[in-house]
Amino acid sequence: MIFFKNLLFFILVSTFTIIFFLFFGIILIFIRVFSSKTIAQKTLRFLIVCYGRIIIFGFARILVKVKFIDSSEGKQALDPCVYVANHSSASDAFLMGVLPGEFVQIVNLWPFKIPILGLCARLAGYLSIRSMSFVDFSKECKLLFSNNISIIGFPEGTRSVSSQMGKFHSTLFRIAKENNLKIVPLCILGNKDKPLRGSLKINPGNIEIHKLPAIDYNEYEHFSSFELKNYTRAKMQIFIDQHKEVI
């Protein structure tokens, strides 16, 4: 039964992806011709979020129930901010569609190699942290922040294989410090086998995305980037350890 549910899911998603981006691709070309690159990018980012939400809350319900939970305890962050999430599955990037506001995802090189979606990510201005120097990356981020656009990244860099997160890289935290921005930790629970690393099989179950209390600049201004990444990681790991029943 799980096999046939997976088969149905991939058939529906593949068909929907082709139709969705062909149809809206024509609209985007029209927008790009008669308006600015900025408007075209904003439109594409909005469409990518819509696409992700349809996948998450529509087709994925064949196998998985996804829930977004605000665990911020009133400590919210307005755009722009820096979202950081734990990373345990190839589905993590799609799950970011639950977030409000306009944002750009910070990714490794491999997502850009995915047919159709990779091209859309490039056109939407998503950034590959591996393909540019920190100086260039910082300039791109400052431009996004000036337009009230947040960034989202996975500071582990690679997927963890257990509930214990890997070491964090410092880049996103350097960016937050340079721009005096709030950091919003996101804890994704229940997705490590949706799918497992090296597999396309999605196992049935529940996924929760928790938005933790925002870390204000005043809270970390005296930290180095190294201290800040470890401070943030510790907060996230404590939360994950407290919710192991979901994992």
Residue ranges of model-derived segments:
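Catalytic-site beta-strand/loop segments enriched in glycine and acidic/polar residues
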Residues: 144-172
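Catalytic core of membrane glycerolipid acyltransferases/transacylases, capturing the structured
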Residues: 29-49, 77-133
